[in-house]
Amino acid sequence: SFIGSLNDFRSYKAKLVGIPMDTDGMNMEALEKALETEKNVKFIYTIPNFQNPSGITMSLEKRHRLYELAKAHDVMILEDNPYGDLYYEGEPLPSIKSFDTDGIVIYAGSFSKVISPGMRVGYAIGPKPVLAKMTVCKQGQDVHTNIWSQVLCYRFMTEYDFDAHLAGLRKIYTKKR
């Protein structure tokens, strides 16, 4: 898991409960048990693609099961997907957010992994009230993201072939693995 996210959660006095990983993602039996026994669960944090530090990608079956468990227990999901565009082969699995019909998934992505690590620019998609609270949390960390980094990301996305750029990155990383 991303240490920055974990530290943000801790700053709000969150009780973090680790869930073991299987070869195809989070252990759903352990998650279900935690959801049944832990009190006041607010959300499930997951990195479904190339989970840090294991590198495991959650299977499609487990993505659907995670969503169903969250829905059944009235819990939101924070889907952190900084590495999702950097797959080596085949097609990427759909995000959990892509089948969210109930508005319970917050999707977070990053340009830091695909444009420049030093820029530290990310984004989130989710319910407006939750995004407003996330903005307050972000402001407590660094007031706001550097405006020039945001402008550079915007210009890169609008003036270059971003899909071709991602394909080039995948070729480079495939050779290095």
Locations of regions flagged by a protein language model:
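Substrate-binding/gating loop at the entrance of the active-site cleft, primarily
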Residues: 1-14
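Conserved core segment of the aminotransferase class I/II
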Residues: 101-171
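Active-site phosphate-binding strand-loop segment of PLP-dependent enzymes
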Residues: 24-88
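Short beta-strand->loop structural element characteristic of the AMP-binding/adenylate-forming
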Residues: 15-23
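Short, intrinsically disordered, charge-balanced linker/junction segments flanking boundaries
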Residues: 16, 169-177
